[in-house]
Curated annotation (Swiss-Prot):
Keywords: 4Fe-4S, Cell inner membrane, Cell membrane, Iron, Iron-sulfur, Membrane, Metal-binding, NAD, Quinone, Translocase, Transport, Ubiquinone
Species in which this protein is naturally found: Campylobacter jejuni subsp. doylei (strain ATCC BAA-1458 / RM4099 / 269.97)
Top enzyme category: translocase
One GO molecular-function entry: NADH dehydrogenase (ubiquinone) activity
UniProt protein name: NADH-quinone oxidoreductase subunit B
Family: Belongs to the complex I 20 kDa subunit family.
Reactions performed catalytically: a quinone + NADH + 5 H(+)(in) = a quinol + NAD(+) + 4 H(+)(out)
InterPro entries: NADH_UbQ_OxRdtase-like_20kDa, NADH_UQ_OxRdtase_20Kd_su
Protein residues bound to [4Fe-4S] cluster: 40-41, 105, 134
GO biological process, one term: aerobic respiration
UniProt xrefs under SUPFAM superfamilies: HydA/Nqo6-like
Length: 167
C-alpha cells in the first residue's frame, strides 16, 4: 500500500501524494517534443517518428514550435554560430522542460574537434538524457524517452524553475 503524506498546516488533513502522482503521470505520458535535427542523427529521429516504432504509444508528439514543447531533442553537430539560436529556442519553451542530446556530435562534439563546433550541447543548455552512438538507432532514442518518463515520475510536481542563464 502506498504511503501518503498528510499536511496539517491548514488545520484540515490534506493528502498531497495523490496530486503529485497525478501530475507526474500526466507530464510523463504526454511528452511534446521539439525535434531539432542538425545533422545525420536527424535521419534516425525521423525514422523514429514513423509507424514502425510508434512513439505515439508513449504520448510523444513532435512539434515544430518551442512554445508548444516540453522536450527538446538535439540531434547532430551544434556549431558555435548556431548556439545562441539554440539557447533562444530553449528559453522559449515553457517550464518544466527537458533536453535529450542525441548522438556523439551533440554529446561531445563527435569527431569534429574544430574551432567552430560546440564540444557538447551541455555547454549551452542543461541536458537531462544523453543518447550515445553515431548515429543512434531509433530503439536507443525510444529507450531514452522511457528513461525520461521514469525521471519525470520521480520529480516533485512543484519542481523548482531554474534561473535563466545568459549566453
Amino acid at each position: 500500500m502506498a504511503e501518503h503524506q498528510v499536511n496539517y498546516a491548514s488545520g484540515l488533513p490534506v493528502v498531497l501524494t495523490s496530486v503529485d502522482k497525478l501530475v507526474q503521470w500526466g507530464r510523463s505520458n504526454s511528452l511534446w517534443a521539439l525535434s531539432y535535427g542538425l545533422a545525420c542523427c536527424a535521419i534516425e529521429m525521423m525514422a523514429a517518428g514513423g509507424s514502425r516504432y510508434d512513439f505515439d504509444r508513449f504520448g510523444t508528439i513532435f512539434r515544430a514550435s518551442p512554445r508548444h514543447s516540453e522536450v527538446m531533442i538535439i540531434a547532430g553537430t551544434l556549431c558555435k554560430k548556431h548556439a545562441e539560436f539554440t539557447r533562444r529556442l530553449y528559453d522559449q519553451m515553457p517550464d518544466p522542460k527537458w533536453v535529450i542530446s542525441m548522438g556523439s556530435c551533440a554529446n561531445t562534439g563527435g569527431m569534429f574537434n574544430t574551432y567552430s563546433t560546440v564540444q557538447g550541447v551541455d555547454r549551452i543548455i542543461p541536458v537531462d538524457i544523453y543518447v550515445p552512438g553515431c548515429a543512434p538507432r531509433p530503439e536507443s532514442f525510444q529507450f531514452a524517452l522511457m528513461i525520461l518518463q521514469k525521471k519525470i515520475r520521480k520529480e516533485k510536481a512543484s519542481r523548482k524553475i531554474a534561473p535563466k542563464r545568459l549566453v
